[in-house]
Amino acid sequence: MKSNLILNKDHVDGFIGETQPLRYLENKNSDEQTLEDLACAIPKLLLTNKIRHQIDALSDDFFSHDLGKYSETELRLLNVQFSFLAHAYVWGDLAPSKVLCKAIALPWSKISEQLGRPAILSYASYCLDNWHKINDDEGVNLDNVALNYNFLGGIDEDWFVTIHVCIEHAANQAIKSSFAIACAYEANQASDSILLEELTKIKESMLRVNHLFRKMPEKCDPYIYYHRVRPYIFGWKNNPGLPDGLIYEGCFDEKPQ
């Protein structure tokens, strides 16, 4: 799948910088408001076994307007919302659904294609595009990061993802320094002093990453995460619960994916 987005080689940063992902659309139309309301209500709808009922009530032409009006940032937000709703729909009942209804499948697949991604809950949608700062004046750290959307909610799910947000932020310097080394070699300017400086930055960045990893057990119980949270992020290809894959209604000639 070819992405429509272009890497700016003049500004290589990490996967998470100081700029927060978009949390809400402004001046929402009725479909955009419905999408946001449903995505925000996922924990309550899963608790009451109403998620499929609410989504099945949407019309087949839900969110059928032109995607060209959205910026990349807005498309990434929409992809987060559709991804969470799709996975909640498939896995949010006693048995997984073999078919994803057209109201979610069609716009989700189009948005994902526009972003150059498969229509699945990816790490980008689950983590990289799914957080905000509690206090805008503070940095990206475990005391100041919260999720925008989740499945069941609760400390274990939120902590698991916010740890990864902060890990990606801590790894920024390693990515920038790695790129700096590559550029130095390409320009035949990879002196010992440049290599030492950038490799030292990479080491310091990885030390911060490891420090954050060690904090995972503080607020994320492995049993709770594995049995209550993780099932919602499963894919479907070769999954025992959906051995033939998932049918995206109205997409891919309705062949299981």
Residue ranges and their predicted role:
Residues 1-257:
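Surface-exposed peri-terminal alpha-helical interaction modules
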